[in-house]
A protein has these predicted regions:
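Short glycine-/acidic-enriched loop or helix-start segments at secondary-structure transitions
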Residues: 5, 24-25, 56-59, 77, ...
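ATP-dependent carboxylate-amine ligase
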Residues: 87, 94, 104-119, 162-169, ...
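Short, structured coil segments at secondary-structure junctions
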Residues: 7, 42, 61-63, 279-282
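Single conserved hydrophobic/aromatic residue that forms the stacking wall/gate
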Residues: 1-12
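Acidic, Mg2+-coordinating active-site environments of NTP-dependent enzymes
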Residues: 15-194
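Generic recognition of short, well-ordered alpha-helical segments
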Residues: 7, 27, 158, 210-213
């Protein structure tokens, strides 16, 4: 908190974990919100995601706020899609909230009829997004090509663009620097397994909104694919075997014709299988293989379909050591 107070400028965006997460670490999003809010100096300039109602509360009653967000996107929905809706009630007055559109989960265009909390007009806006093509446009002018074709990544890039722009960097320079940016922390890794190509997406198990975006990345691939989900450890820091967060994840996203096989692996494979038994995914697509090496061997075949691996920081090395990292 002292470190935050020393900062005159602060960026709070959609990836700051103001979502449901592991109880042993983050408690509840509103608890985290209050802890951060109390640490913000009154003169701090905030850079906020206007599409997240809880994050937007940081700017409630403040003038020194720069807002970023997404405009109307082709993937928007009129109804909420997911397991739970953290945007159902206003984070400010707790009254029922209305949405004109959802980008994903509770991120979208919202308004509270009671207290007036609503999505603010944005200075930096994703005005178009073609995830299949892998391209977004900011403020109808700056085009950025995507390496990771997910809305979650779009918001990260938009936040980075906003911060760089308000600090004086030319927009064209920012767009060029961000285009085809590859994460250096191995959150997303491409690999080869025999004759098959694949992508490992590191997803925090307990953050269901992040996890949903990883599932959607696989499900929306226009090519056929197999999906390997590994839950071998729950936390790197805390000793816990709590897997209740599995029930917050929208595994129905894998009910897609392009997803041919789903392999569940790791210590908690049977917990995964139980969760999948309550999903709409075809049971015939699901195979449970506890041993990770055996799961890799099962996928090492002559098929040409791409492989998506979805796992956490603790478990990704257990898979990557068995394949050729590109």
């Amino acid at each position: 908190h002292k470190a935050i107070r020393r900062q005159r400028q602060m960026c709070i965006r959609d990836s700051t974990n103001l979502y449901r997460d592991q109880l042993t670490r983050n408690g509840h999003p509103e608890w985290v919100y209050n802890a951060v809010k109390d640490s913000i100096h009154p003169e701090t300039q905030l850079i906020l995601n206007a599409d997240d109602p809880l994050v937007s509360c940081f700017g409630y009653g403040r003038d020194n706020v720069v807002w970023f967000g997404a405009g109307n996107l082709p993937t928007d929905t009129k109804e909420f899609v997911g397991v739970y809706n953290d945007g159902a009630y206003c984070p400010h007055c707790k009254s029922p909230m209305t949405y004109s559109s959802y980008h994903y989960d509770h991120i979208g265009n919202y308004e509270c009829p009671n207290c007036g909390l609503k999505r603010q007009d944005t200075s930096y806006t994703v005005t178009s997004a073609d995830l299949e093509k892998g391209e977004i446009t900011i403020n109808n002018k700056y085009k950025i090509e995507l390496t990771l074709k997910s809305l979650y990544n779009v918001y990260n890039l938009l936040a980075a663009f906003t911060v760089a722009s308000i600090t004086g960097v030319d927009g064209n320079t920012i767009a060029k620097s961000l285009s085809n940016y590859v994460l250096k922390n191995f959150r997303v890794v491409t690999f080869t397994l025999g004759n098959r190509k694949g992508t490992l997406v590191t997803s925090k198990h307990e953050n269901s909104i992040s996890y949903n975006q990883s599932l959607k990345l696989a499900a929306s691939d226009k090519d056929k694919c197999d999906v390997l989900i590994i839950v071998d450890a729950v936390s790197r820091k805390y000793f816990t075997s709590d897997v209740s967060w599995l029930w917050d994840i929208n595994f129905d996203l894998l009910k897609s014709d392009n997803v041919k096989n789903i392999v569940l692996a790791g210590t908690y494979c049977n917990d995964l299988a139980t969760r999948f038994s309550f999903s709409k995914v075809d049971r015939n697509k699901i195979k449970v293989i506890k041993d990770i090496e055996e799961a890799v061997d099962y996928l090492d075949n002559d098929r040409k379909e791409k492989i998506y691996v979805i796992t956490c920081f603790s478990d990704k090395g257990k898979f990557l050591e068995k394949v050729k990292v590109d």
